[in-house]
Amino acid sequence: MNYINAHGTSTDANDRNESKAIRTVFGSHADALMVSSSKSMSGHLLGAAGGLEAVITAKAIAHGVVPPTATLEHPGEGCDLDFVPGSARDAQIDVAISNAFGFGGTNAVLVFRRYDG
């Protein structure tokens, strides 16, 4: 696991809880993960957000470029991961996930793996 396209709504509660969940699931490996939110560039597209973010995650793997959290200046309290602030980062991504958390508890995590075949 190299990259997470976070749900990342830039709200204190969501970002703090998502960061905590990433640390809970990945333990010490969380420090090695690149985490960004494509919503920082597109805004929240409501029902279309999950689909677009899945495409962005797959394209990040295919092109070896992690999209930035473009507008991040100061992460909130409890948000201490590598949020790829400011500009994109070249990186080989073997496995990535895209988080999508919907209103009313409809939540999904899609896992993508690079295919070299």
Where are the regions a protein language model picked out?
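Conserved "HGTGT" condensation-loop signature of ketosynthase/thiolase-family condensing enzymes
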Residues: 2-117
